[in-house]
C-alpha cells in the first residue's frame, strides 16, 4: 500500500511539541493527562474524536478498549491514522468529514423510468446525517472550537447544537482564549476574529451556551494556561 499524501497537518503534533510517547505519561502535559483521566473516569464504550488529526487521542482511547470514530478534513492525517490503526489492530474508524457536513443528508432524485416512477426518493434520505450515524457515548472536540468560531464564523450555539446531537452522554471540549499564542501570532487562520470581542467570546459565554444542551459542566486545566478543558455531561 502506498504511503498517504503529505500535508502541512501531518506533522501537527510534532510541530506543537505534543507528539508524546503514549506509554510514558511522565512526559505528557496537563492536556494529555486531563483527557486520559476523563476517559478513565467516564468509561465510554464509544467515542467520536472530531478534528482528530493523526489521532493521538483516538489511539489513547482505542488502547483502552474503546471503539473510536476519528474525523478530520485532512486526507493525509486520516490516511496515516488508518494505516496505524490497521497495523496495530485498533478499533478506530477514520473518516474524512468536516464539521459543516455533520448535519448533511442526501436525498434521491425523481426518476422517469417506469420501474421507479411511483417511488418518492425524497421521502427519506439515502444518506443519513453524521449526527445520526456517528453518535457516541463521548465526543472529543479538542483544539477545534476556536477554528470553528473565529475562523469559519460558526455560532457557538450552533456548534453545541450539533455536538449535543452527536454526544449520547459526554462532551470533552477545549476552550482556547483570544490571548492564546497561536491565535495572536497567526491571525490569518482566524478570518472572523474581528466579529468577536472579549465580551462575546470567552469561557463564560461558551459554558453558558453549553448548559443549554448539557446538564453539568466541569473545568479542567489544560496547557498552556490560555486553554481549558470543559467536560459537559447530559
Q: Language-model segments: which ranges?
A:
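Conserved SAM-binding loop of SAM-dependent methyltransferases across substrates and taxa
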Residues: 54-66
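Conserved class I S-adenosyl-L-methionine
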Residues: 43-53
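S-adenosyl-L-methionine
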Residues: 82-133
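Conserved alpha-helix/loop element of class I SAM-dependent methyltransferases that forms part
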Residues: 26-43
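Conserved beta-strand signature within the Rossmann-like core of class I S-adenosyl-L-methionine
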Residues: 165-177
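A conserved beta-strand element that flanks and buttresses the S-adenosyl-L-methionine
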Residues: 140
Amino acid at each position: 500500500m502506498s504511503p498517504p499524501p503529505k500535508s502541512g497537518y501531518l506533522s501537527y503534533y510534532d510541530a506543537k511539541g505534543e507528539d508524546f510517547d503514549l506509554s510514558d505519561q511522565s512526559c505528557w502535559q496537563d492536556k494529555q493527562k486531563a483527557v486520559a483521566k476523563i476517559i478513565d473516569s467516564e468509561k465510554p464504550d464509544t467515542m467520536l474524536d472530531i478534528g482528530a488529526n493523526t489521532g493521538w487521542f483516538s489511539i489513547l482511547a482505542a488502547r483502552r478498549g474503546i471503539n473510536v470514530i476519528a474525523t478530520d478534513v485532512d486526507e493525509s492525517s486520516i490516511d496515516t491514522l488508518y494505516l496505524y490503526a490497521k497495523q496495530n489492530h485498533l478499533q478506530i474508524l477514520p473518516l474524512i468529514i468536516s464539521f459543516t457536513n455533520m448535519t448533511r443528508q442526501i436525498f434521491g432524485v425523481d426518476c422517469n423510468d417506469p420501474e421507479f416512477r411511483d417511488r418518492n426518493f425524497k421521502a427519506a434520505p439515502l444518506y443519513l446525517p453524521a449526527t445520526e450515524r456517528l453518535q457516541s457515548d463521548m465526543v472529543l472536540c479538542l483544539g477545534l472550537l476556536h477554528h470553528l468560531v473565529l475562523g469559519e464564523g460558526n455560532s457557538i450555539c450552533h456548534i453545541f447544537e450539533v455536538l449535543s446531537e452527536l454526544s449520547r452522554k459526554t462532551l470533552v471540549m477545549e476552550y482556547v482564549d483570544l490571548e492564546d499564542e497561536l491565535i495572536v501570532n497567526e491571525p490569518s487562520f482566524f478570518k472572523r476574529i474581528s466579529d468577536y470581542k472579549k465580551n462575546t467570546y470567552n469561557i463564560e459565554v461558551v459554558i453558558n451556551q453549553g448548559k443549554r444542551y448539557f446538564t453539568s459542566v466541569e473545568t479542567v486545566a489544560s496547557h498552556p494556561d490560555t486553554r481549558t478543558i470543559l467536560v459537559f455531561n447530559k
